[in-house]
Amino acid sequence: MAVMPPRTLLLLLSGALALTQTWAGSHSMRYFYTSVSRPGRGEPRFIAVGYVDDTQFVRFDSDAASQRMEPRAPWIEQEGPEYWDQETRNMKASAQTDRVDLGTLRGYYNQSEDGSHTIQIMYGCDVGSDGRFLRGYRQDAYDGKDYIALNEDLRSWTAAAMAAQITKRKWEAAHAAEQLRAYLEGRCVEWLRRYLENGKETLQRTDPPKTHMTHHPISDHEATLRCWALGFYPAVITLTWQRDGEDQTQDTELVETRPAGDGTFQKWAAVVVPSGEEQRYTCHVQHEGLPKPLTLRWEPSSQPTIPIVGIIAGLVLLGAVITGAVVAAVMWRRKSSDRKGGSYTQAASSDSAQGSDVSLTACKV
């Protein structure tokens, strides 16, 4: 089944970095599946992507020529052919499950065969800085609305729709939660630890933001101050504006964190200020790559050049990334900070022939 899906490309773009919330000191592995029916044009399109923290590492697209799970990060390419064979089998099995589920759900909702419908799934696990299991997830949605979710106890389900009560009863009878919990607490954690170790130069690094401020006159009476943070990793960052030391949260225009195209991220926050009062406003930047928070104030004598080319390039790449990974869902926001890198010993039981994802064929709606 599915996870809360974006229904338009705009939502997909705005949700590019909207991964599930994690806590301080933790790391996460998430898989996002999306299936979209297309009546009269063959079988549904199935796209899956896997993320470790903010980094996409695998991708599968049923429309691709290869029909294979494909690497999206250098450190995953070292996995052997057994790994890729199993991952591909899991993806194809999940695609077929979703194909059946789309028909089942259409019946639950008494919908005609003419319209296009969407199923999504998000599942995964978090580990702490010591590599131990913290929590697991499984959330599903249908046509952009919550459908069913695994509860925090990993033993029960919450149905968010009347039709989902049917699914809940089916899954309870099939002991689906127990099967999923075994994966989340076991193989999911083992593979996440393995990935963190193999990709530690990328996944456990911290790149502090490069910051500056720009000034944009609106009229003779007002101007926009924009606070920029560029080239940082991980994606979690806080930009806040203050006026005479008081937070201006409600008056701040804040964009979603965006990939820059080089493995780092970008973000800006802006406020409209009365002309002549710019010095009363300060921008405060917090990121784990900084030894202490930064405070920026507009300095008229040293107005920087806005890196428009870099920003546009990042936005163009963002479109390509999300179109290729149609599943980075719009609901979940990474809000953690202070994720400290550690050494994650590879679990001996991480069998490449099993793969790090899970075939969800048992969870038919």
Curated annotation (Swiss-Prot):
| Classification via SUPFAM superfamilies | Immunoglobulin, MHC antigen-recognition domain
Q: Primary place of residence?
A: membrane
Q: Where is this region: Alpha-1?
A: 25-114
What topology in the membrane does the UniProt record assign? Single-pass type I membrane protein
Membrane-spanning ranges: 309-332
Could you list this entry's UniProt keywords, alphabetically sorted: Disulfide bond, Glycoprotein, Immunity, Membrane, MHC I, Phosphoprotein, Signal, Transmembrane, Transmembrane helix
Which residues lie within the region annotated Connecting peptide?
A: 299-308
> What cellular-component terms does GO give this entry?
early endosome membrane; ER to Golgi transport vesicle membrane; external side of plasma membrane; extracellular space; lumenal side of endoplasmic reticulum membrane; MHC class I protein complex; phagocytic vesicle membrane; recycling endosome membrane
Which InterPro entries has this protein been placed in? Ig-like_dom (IPR007110), Ig-like_dom_sf (IPR036179), Ig-like_fold (IPR013783), Ig/MHC_CS (IPR003006), Ig_C1-set (IPR003597), MHC_class-I_related (IPR050208), MHC_I-like_Ag-recog (IPR011161), MHC_I-like_Ag-recog_sf (IPR037055)
**Which residue intervals make up region (Disordered)?**
339-360
In what residue span(s) does the Ig-like C1-type domain sit?
209-295
Q: Name one Pfam family in it.
A: MHC_I_C
> Where in the cell?
Membrane
Q: Report the GO molecular function annotations.
A: peptide antigen binding; signaling receptor binding
Q: How does it assemble?
A: Heterodimer of an alpha chain and a beta chain (beta-2-microglobulin).
The similarity annotation says: Belongs to the MHC class I family.
Q: What's the name of the protein?
A: Patr class I histocompatibility antigen, A-108 alpha chain
To which species is this protein native?
Pan troglodytes (Chimpanzee)
